């Protein structure tokens, strides 16, 4: 069995205003830095063998807090990077709703059919994270693996782990500095904890529903 701990990065400077980040690279907010420390404190109780992170700053800095508490290195992994939002990158949700109303509707209602103009499709994200998870299963059997990623690849990972269609993409909560625990067993994957945020206390902020 692999014990998989999926982590969403702590709050970035753009999260509170509802700005699509994609492959752009804002820093953690001051609240996000506090969230990352609280998350690291929470996970310090676990035995951890390896930590993977998306190479973007908001994920890597979150992963570093976890790694330093356990004296581990962080392995940067391109396959778990955020979706390329293309033309939406850097735009506020309200701006996207006004400029691309039909595309926004499709993203909220039919995400499995979306390919961002100048960017990436959800199917592409699914394929890359599924390949990564298959490699984790083979390489880290009988280990505990932390994966620090973003909302879109994490929701795609949940779909891959449970064998459900990408149309169910929005069915999984994914707040900043949350973590989930999944047992990757021989015949099935079992979600034991999903979107845990109780360690954040007063620094918890509910994620925007359309990002």
UniProtKB/Swiss-Prot annotation:
It is an enzyme of class 3 (hydrolase). The keyword Hydrolase applies. Activity is not inhibited by EDTA in vitro, nor enhanced by the addition of Mg(2+). InterPro entries: His_Pase_superF_clade-1, His_PPase_superfam, PGM_Phosphatase. It comes from the Bacteria. It catalyses: O-phospho-L-serine + H2O = L-serine + phosphate; O-phospho-D-serine + H2O = D-serine + phosphate. Pfam families: His_Phos_1. Catalyzes the dephosphorylation of L-phosphoserine to serine and inorganic phosphate. Is poorly or not active toward D-phosphoserine, DL-phosphothreonine, 3-phosphoglycerate, para-nitrophenylphosphate, and fructose-6-phosphate. Does not display phosphoglycerate mutase activity. This is Phosphoserine phosphatase 1. It comes from Hydrogenobacter thermophilus (strain DSM 6534 / IAM 12695 / TK-6).
